[in-house]
């Protein structure tokens, strides 16, 4: 339809999720998300169970309309896993929004509220981890 390759058109942030309890956000990306998402990697999730809803969901172009995510949680191999596909190392001392998101995630995964409900096969995780 367009003269350029299809691309994503934004993110849907599930701000009501407890992972964001200590990170101010709306249901869409605001200014604080620029630094966080600048070097993020999108995970193709169309083969995952329908019930798995990424807490940071990438909105694909209408040409493709695939399920994409940057952050999600699941049960894998009897354990609990939270995946966040963003750069968490580069110049972190200069990135207050990223630090605050990581602090919120850390508090969440250490709490009793971290209880993923959807089971994923380990092969899915291996498909995007190098």
Per-range role (PLM):
Residues 97-109:
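Short amphipathic C-terminal alpha-helix that caps PH/PH-like domains
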Residues 1-96, 113-130:
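Catalytic beta-strand/loop cores that center a nucleophilic Ser/Cys/Thr
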